[in-house]
A protein has these predicted regions:
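Nucleic-acid endo/exonuclease domains
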Residues: 1-124, 128-162
Length: 162
């Protein structure tokens, strides 16, 4: 059986069709980002979106508390990598996808380290967690805010010498 060089994925799309599909994948204002932002807004939290002044341009930033939030898609950010990678190794374009997703994972880790070094709290959510458990995601953010507030209180308390 002969395979066309046009077919690089394990589906029936041509190279041009695949290219068009990949171009249409959104990098900002995705459904999961909008869902989480709406939930935060309803709770009274104000934020900036796609904040360019920070490494990695976080999807949501609560500047008041120095919290950077990322809404990561499972495939492109390599959720369950130990399961996904062997599956990708069997695909037609395995080298490309393994390299791309591995680099995404490395970049995510580099961004986390840079933000932590700058004194930011980094929170990453998987898309499915946002969709299925939005309230739990909000609780995680609220717990981070509480911890930050408690840390500020301790600092000011200690500075007063009491």
């Amino acid at each position: 059986m002969l395979f066309s060089k046009e077919r690089e994925m394990s589906d029936d799309l041509t190279k041009e069709q695949r290219h068009k599909n990949m171009q249409n994948i959104k990098s900002s204002d995705t459904k999961i980002e909008v869902l989480l932002r709406k939930a935060l807004w309803q709770k009274g939290y104000r934020y900036r979106k796609n904040y360019k002044d920070l490494p990695g341009k976080p999807d949501i930033v609560i500047t008041k508390y120095k919290i950077a939030i990322f809404c990561d898609g499972e495939f492109f950010h390599g959720k369950d990598w130990e399961v996904l990678k062997p599956r990708l190794e069997k695909s037609n374009n395995s080298e490309y996808w393994i390299s791309k997703i591995s680099r995404n994972r490395e970049r995510d880790e580099e961004i986390n380290k840079k933000l932590l070094f700058l004194g930011w709290t980094v929170i990453r959510f998987w898309g499915k967690d946002i969709k299925k458990n939005t309230d739990e995601c909000i609780k995680v953010i609220e717990e981070a805010i509480f911890d930050i507030k408690m840390g500020e209180d301790k600092i000011s308390f200690d500075e007063d010498g009491k």
